[in-house]
Regions:
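Low-complexity "stalk/linker" and mucin-like segments enriched in Ser/Thr/Pro/Ala/Gly
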Residues: 152, 156-180
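Beta-strand elements of well-folded, non-transmembrane domains
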Residues: 146, 161-165, 201-205
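Short, surface-exposed polybasic-aromatic patches that bind anionic ligands, especially phosphate groups
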Residues: 1-118
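Short beta-strand element of the conserved SAM-dependent methyltransferase core
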Residues: 142-144, 161, 183-189
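Enriched for extracellular/lumenal, surface-exposed ectodomains of secreted and cell-surface proteins
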Residues: 191, 197-209
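Beta-strand-rich structural segments
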Residues: 134-150, 195
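Short S/T/G/P-enriched beta-strand
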Residues: 108-137
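Short, hydrophobic beta-strand segments
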Residues: 175-193
C-alpha cells in the first residue's frame, strides 16, 4: 500500500493534526481506517468479508461510486466507516467531535451520502416465471430493488433457467443491467420437466483487514 493522495482527505486537530478520509491506496482501491487512534500500517493482512447486510452494501456502493470523489466525499465515507464499524467506538466518539468542529459542513454531507446509498445500493433482486402450457414457452421478469423496495437501475445481473429450457439467445442464462422498470425475457422449453428461474446481481462488498 501507499499513502493516500492529496485531495482525498480533510484535516482536523485532535492532540495534533489528524486526517479523515482515505488513509492508504493501491492501484485500484482506497482504504479507510476503522480503528481510531491507531497508526496506519501500509501492509495488508488477511481480509475478511464484512457481513452482507444493508450497512455493508451501502458502504460498498459509496466506496465504489465515489472512488474518484472529492476530499469531502472521502471524508464522509470515512466518518460512516468509523460510525458503523470502528473497533474503538469510545475513542472515535471524541475524535468525531473534533472532526465536525473543524469541518462544519461535513455533517450534512455524511447524512446526504448515506441517504443516497440507501436509494442506490441494491438490496434484493427478484425473478418471476410464467409458463404457457400449450406452447411450452414462458417469460422471466427481472427487477432489482433497494432497501426501501423501490426498483433501481444500473445494476448488473444474470438470470438463469434451471431445467430444460433456453432464452431467445439459445442459452440458459441472460445477463443485463437493471432498469427503472422490470425487464422481461422470453424462453422456450427444450424437453420435459419443470423449469425454474434464479437471478444473481452485482452488490459491492467491504473487505476488513
Amino acid at each position: 500500500l501507499s499513502r493516500a493522495d492529496a485531495g482525498t482527505f480533510l484535516r482536523y486537530e485532535h492532540g495534533g493534526e489528524q486526517v479523515i478520509g482515505v488513509m492508504a491506496k493501491d492501484s485500484t482501491n482506497n482504504y479507510y481506517c476503522i480503528e481510531s487512534g491507531e497508526r496506519v500500517e501500509y501492509q495488508l493482512g488477511e481480509s475478511v468479508k464484512l457481513r452482507d447486510d444493508d450497512t455493508a452494501r451501502r458502504l460498498g456502493w459509496l466506496m465504489d461510486h465515489y472512488r474518484d470523489g472529492t476530499a469531502a466525499e472521502h471524508a464522509a465515507i470515512a466518518v460512516l466507516a468509523h460510525d458503523l464499524l470502528d473497533l474503538k467506538p469510545d475513542t472515535w466518539k471524541s475524535r468525531r467531535v473534533s472532526v465536525m468542529r473543524d469541518n462544519p459542513t461535513l455533517r450534512r454531507k455524511v447524512e446526504q451520502m448515506w441517504e443516497e446509498a440507501g436509494s442506490n445500493a441494491p438490496a434484493n433482486a427478484t425473478v418471476t416465471r410464467t409458463y404457457a402450457e400449450g406452447t411450452r414457452t414462458g417469460r422471466v421478469t427481472v427487477s432489482v430493488t433497494n432497501a426501501q423496495g423501490k426498483t433501481i437501475a444500473g445494476i448488473k445481473y444474470a438470470a438463469t433457467l434451471n431445467g430444460p429450457a433456453v432464452f431467445a439467445n439459445g442459452s440458459a442464462t441472460v445477463t443485463g443491467i437493471s432498469g427503472a422498470e422490470p425487464i422481461v425475457y422470453s424462453w422456450k422449453a427444450t424437453g420435459e420437466g419443470e423449469v425454474k428461474a434464479s437471478v444473481a446481481y452485482d452488490r459491492k462488498q467491504v473487505d476488513v483487514f
